[in-house]
């Protein structure tokens, strides 16, 4: 995956902004500082594809109290931005879709990315 399309603003919660680093990576995934080439196990949601559409449709059936914006997946794990966070640096929620009680919160995309690069999941 060399690049990916973001969900358009009309699909996002009012006031929500993607993190700047995420936007840059969407245009060039080689900006991810991989430990080894092609060793990044997460796949970014690519707006306009069936997978991204399905992730978006089912986003609120997972944890209905949260306004989730799906952005990456790795097997049964899905990463979401907190759509209620309008700071421009939203927290990230990673959920095991096979067991939604198994989920983690991260303060930012950069914090999540650091662990994703290390293949923590």
Feature-to-residue mapping (PLM):
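Short, isolated positions within intrinsically disordered regulatory regions of eukaryotic proteins
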Residues: 46-48, 81, 116
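A surface-exposed partner-binding patch
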Residues: 1-77
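A short, sequence-level motif marking secondary-structure junctions
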Residues: 84-87, 109-111
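Short aromatic-glycine-(Arg/Gly/Cys) micro-motifs in beta-strand/loop hairpins
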Residues: 88-96
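Broad, structure-driven detector of short, well-ordered beta-strand segments within folded domains
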Residues: 77-85
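Pocket-edge structural micro-motifs
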Residues: 72-73, 83, 96
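Compact, glycine/acidic-enriched structural inserts
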Residues: 98-121
């Amino acid at each position: 995956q060399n690049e990916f399309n973001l969900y358009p603003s009309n699909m996002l919660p009012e006031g929500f902004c993607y993190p700047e680093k995420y936007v840059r990576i969407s245009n060039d995934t080689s900006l991810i500082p991989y430990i080894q080439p092609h060793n990044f196990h997460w796949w970014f949601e690519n707006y306009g594809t069936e997978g991204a559409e399905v992730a978006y449709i089912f986003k609120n059936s997972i944890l209905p109290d949260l306004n989730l914006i799906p952005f990456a997946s790795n097997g049964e794990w899905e990463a979401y931005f907190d759509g209620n966070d309008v700071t421009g640096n939203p927290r990230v929620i990673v959920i095991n879709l096979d067991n939604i009680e198994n989920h983690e919160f991260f303060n930012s995309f950069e914090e999540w990315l650091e662990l994703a690069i290390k293949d923590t999941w």
